[in-house]
Structure formats: structure tokens, C-alpha cells
A protein has these predicted regions:
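Cationic, amphipathic, low-complexity segments that mediate targeting or membrane/lipid association
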Residues: 3-23, 29
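Generic early N-terminus positional signal peaking at residue ~5-7
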Residues: 6, 48-49
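Hydrophobic alpha-helical context, especially transmembrane and signal-peptide helices
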Residues: 13, 27-28, 48, 92
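Short, Lys/Arg-enriched N-terminal segments with co-localized hydrophobic residues
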Residues: 19, 33-43
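Phosphate- and other anionic-substrate recognition elements at nucleic-acid/protein interfaces
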Residues: 39-47, 53-179
């Protein structure tokens, strides 16, 4: 459960008394989705990690777990060492689970870097105390580059953006698979 700051507590208490308190509860209460037979599933905000040697691309889901959005690219050592900027993202976005891209071959088997990525992702998840899932990231960087080229960016301008776009692409695929 995310920690509540004094400011957040004040806002929550003030808004609970307001005429639109019901709307406020809908906005701050995690969404529930009824699956056949009345079974409800609680959605969680998810952070995707596209882990590279130099950079880690980050993407985040909406609270309902339906839409992914590119967020940021951080130096790999900041994320791997659970640096201040990464911790702030996890706390501010109230992240409840992580999804890491896993490099797969075209045959659907784990690629040569998969073991290293798996180890790094597990280290990050352990430091955050969050559950970790893996997702096939096959061709996500290539698709991210294609999207950025269509937007008119050259290779140099793409450099920092490809990783977060790729993270958003495989996070969206993972979110869709959870529905």
C-alpha cells in the first residue's frame, strides 16, 4: 500500500467531505474488473523496464492497467543501484508491480542476454520489494525506431527515446495479455 504524505492526507480528508466525495473515491480507489462468474480483479499501476547495458527505458501503465505511456530513460547504474531518481519514480507513480522485457530469439527461445537481464530485473524488484513479471520484448526496439523515424527524428535525436518507447510497446502487449 502506498505511503500517504501529510499533503495527500489533507487533500483526501478535505475531498471526502466535499459534495463530489463519491467521484473522489472513484479516482483514488484502484479499478476493479469483473471477470466471468463475478470474480473481481484489482488492477495495479505497472512500471516497465527495458534494461540495457547503458540505459533503462521506463514506461508506466494507467491505474486501470489498460494503457501504457513512455516515461523516462535513466542511466542503468541509477536503476540497478536503486538510485534516488528511480526510487522517486516508483514512489511518486505508486508503482505496485514491475514488468521487464526479456530478449527472445525469433524462434521464441530466450536470447543470449536473457540470463543477464533476468538477474538485473530480479535485483531491481528485490530492492523495490515489488512483484516482477517478464514479457517478450522481441522487436520492440526496432518498432520504437520505426515510430520515431515516422515522427521525423534522426538516429542522434532517437538515442534517448528508443528505450522508453520500446518499454511502452512491450508493456502495452503485456497489459493486453492480462485482460
Amino acid at each position: 500500500m502506498p505511503r500517504s504524505t501529510p499533503r495527500a492526507s489533507f487533500l483526501q480528508n478535505s475531498l471526502k467531505k466535499a459534495p463530489f466525495a463519491g467521484l473522489f473515491r472513484k479516482l483514488v480507489t484502484p479499478a476493479r474488473h469483473s471477470e466471468g462468474g463475478g470474480k473481481e480483479r484489482l488492477y495495479m499501476r505497472t512500471l516497465a523496464l527495458d534494461i540495457g547495458e547503458i540505459r533503462v527505458g521506463l514506461a508506466v501503465s494507467d491505474p486501470a492497467g489498460k494503457i501504457s505511456t513512455p516515461l523516462k530513460v535513466l542511466p542503468a547504474d541509477v536503476v540497478l543501484n536503486h538510485g534516488t531518481e528511480f526510487r522517486r519514480i516508483v514512489e511518486d507513480w505508486e508503482i505496485e508491480q514491475l514488468v521487464s522485457g526479456l530478449p527472445m530469439t525469433m524462434a521464441g527461445e530466450e536470447g543470449p542476454q536473457a540470463a543477464s537481464i533476468r538477474e538485473k530485473a530480479q535485483k531491481i524488484a528485490k530492492a523495490c520489494g515489488l512483484p516482477l513479471f517478464f514479457c517478450d520484448e522481441r522487436l520492440s526496439s526496432r518498432e520504437a525506431k520505426r515510430i520515431l523515424r515516422e515522427e521525423g527524428l534522426d538516429e542522434r535525436a532517437m538515442r534517448g527515446k528508443v528505450d522508453m518507447i520500446a518499454a511502452s510497446l512491450f508493456l502495452q502487449a503485456w497489459l493486453d495479455s492480462q485482460m
